[in-house]
Structure formats: C-alpha cells, structure tokens
C-alpha cells in the first residue's frame, strides 16, 4: 500500500470525506480535498508520506506519530531507507515497547521518540535504546508539574511536550502563558499548531 500523511485515524476532521483512512484505496483518497485549520475546504489533496518527506529532506526533522495507526513496520522502514532519511525522522512510539522493539529489530539505526507515562518507561528506554532515543516526551500535565523531568534530563535527552489546545490558541490573543510555562519547566521541544507565533515570541524574548 501507499502511506499517506494523515494525523487522525479517520478523515472526517481533515477532509470532505468520512470514515477510516484504511478503508479507502489511495486512488479514492485522491478524490478528496483537505480542510484548513478552521474547517474550510481547500484545493489541496491528501499528500503521500513520501512526497511530504521529500519536501523537507535536508531542511527539517520530521516527527511521525505512527503508533496505533496500523502502519506496517516493514513499509515504514523501507520508505525511510529508500529516501535515506533514517537520521531525519523521529518515529513516535509512545510507551509501546513491542512496537519500539519491532522497529529497532527492522533497523537498529532508527530514531525513536518514546513517551514516559511512568518512571519505568524512562528506565526501559535508557537501558535498551541508548542509540535510538535522543528525546523523551511527557504529557502536558506531567511536564508542567515537573514530573520525571530530572530523570529524563539526566539521560542526556531532550524533553518534549505540547501545548496544543487552549494554551496554544491563546497565542492568537497574544497570551503566551502556556509557552512560558513550558520554558520555565525546561522543556526543549514544544509542539504547537502556531509555530510562527511561538518562534516570533521566543526570538523577542531572546530565548533563541
């Protein structure tokens, strides 16, 4: 099959179609149009993952949320090898140890992006994936509470969390408290739907 770039398991929110992504053929998906963030229909089609990766190759790092998306390990690994992008794509595995194991077994050089839901997740990935993990994720609540922060930092990993939701949309009203909260908790990578606003604010405050 052909991998496409789609965050949700269904196409209801992001296109003018409905149902599960996996229930459609690639040809059928190409008949649909994407919606913008406000839900307005655009003239854009659903991109293949390969096309999206090619656009950013050598320019950005990709963070792909593929866990629980029914993405076959062999298909994902083959695509990254084909594009020579094993070192440019971080594969989000949450704390799914079986999926992480299967990915590493298929290609020992892949970059994995796990999430710590408990301290034993940190211990596990630190002991078994020292060459694969450079960044660990915490939930928004755990990050703001400072939970497990020092343990993750002690491994030499970057710390990732997100402000998607109210803290994110608040930036549209010039309220950056959610972002500042992450900075104060020493979060290195903050996921946001408003990267340009966040970058402008960080630059104005000389954080970058």
Descriptions of predicted regions:
Residues 1, 8-9, 32, 67-69, ...:
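Active-site beta-loop-alpha junctions enriched in small/polar residues
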Residues 49, 55-69, 195:
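Active-site groove signature of glycoside hydrolases
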Residues 25, 45-49, 72, 76, ...:
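Stable alpha-helical elements in mature extracytoplasmic
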Residues 1-58:
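An active-site metal/cofactor-coordinating segment within enzyme catalytic domains
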Residues 42-44, 62-69, 83-148, 190:
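Catalytic beta/alpha-barrel core
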Residues 18, 23-26, 82, 129-132, ...:
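Alpha-helix termination/capping residues and helix-transition junctions
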Residues 34, 54-57, 61, 81-85, ...:
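Sec-exported extracytoplasmic/periplasmic mature domains
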Residues 39-41, 115-117, 123-208:
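C-terminal active-site rim and adjoining tail of enzyme catalytic domains
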């Amino acid at each position: 099959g052909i991998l496409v770039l789609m965050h949700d398991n269904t196409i209801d929110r992001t296109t003018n179609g409905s149902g599960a992504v996996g229930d459609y053929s690639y040809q059928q998906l190409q008949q649909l149009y994407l919606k913008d963030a406000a839900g307005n229909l655009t003239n854009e089609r659903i991109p293949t993952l390969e096309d999206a990766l090619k656009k950013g190759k050598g320019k950005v790092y990709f963070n792909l949320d593929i866990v629980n998306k029914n993405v076959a390990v062999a298909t994902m690994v083959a695509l990254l090898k084909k594009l020579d992008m094993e070192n440019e794509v971080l594969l989000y595995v949450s704390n799914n140890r079986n999926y992480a194991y299967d990915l590493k077994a298929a290609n020992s050089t892949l970059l994995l992006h796990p999430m710590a839901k408990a301290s034993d997740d940190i211990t596990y990935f630190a002991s078994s994936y020292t060459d694969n993990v450079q960044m660990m994720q915490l939930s928004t609540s755990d990050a703001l509470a400072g939970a497990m922060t020092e343990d993750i930092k002690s491994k030499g990993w970057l710390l990732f969390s997100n402000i998607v939701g109210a803290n994110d949309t608040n930036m549209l009203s010039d309220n950056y408290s959610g972002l500042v909260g992450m900075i104060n908790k020493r979060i290195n990578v903050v996921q946001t739907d408003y990267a340009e606003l966040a970058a402008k604010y960080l630059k104005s405050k000389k954080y970058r």
